[in-house]
Amino acid sequence: YSKSLPLSVLNP
């Protein structure tokens, strides 16, 4: 990932 993690990864 670039800088910020997408929330979809933390909340499938």
Curated annotation (Swiss-Prot):
Keywords: Antibiotic, Antimicrobial. Active between pH 2 and 12. It comes from the Bacteria. Active between 37 and 90 degrees Celsius. Activity is reduced at 100 degrees Celsius and absent at 110 degrees Celsius. Activity is unaffected by storage at -20 degrees Celsius. One of its GO terms (biological process) is defense response to Gram-positive bacterium. Has bactericidal activity against E.coli ATCC 29522 and S.aureus. Inhibits growth of S.marcescens and B.cereus ATCC 14579. A synthetic peptide has antibacterial activity against E.coli ATCC 29522 (MIC=8 ug/ml), S.aureus (MIC=64 ug/ml), S.marcescens (MIC=32 ug/ml), B.cereus ATCC 14579 (MIC=64 ug/ml), B.subtilis (MIC=32 ug/ml), L.plantarum ATCC 8014 (MIC=32 ug/ml), B.flexus (MIC=32 ug/ml), S.enteritidis ATCC 13076 (MIC=4 ug/ml), Enterobacter spp (MIC=32 ug/ml), B.anthracis (MIC=128 ug/ml), B.licheniformis (MIC>128 ug/ml) and L.lactis ATCC 11454 (MIC>128 ug/ml). A synthetic peptide has no antibacterial activity against S.agalactiae ATCC 12386, S.epidermidis, P.aeruginosa and methicillin-resistant S.aureus (MRSA). This is Antimicrobial protein AN5-1. It comes from Paenibacillus alvei. The lineage of its organism: Bacteria, Bacillati, Bacillota, Bacilli, Bacillales.
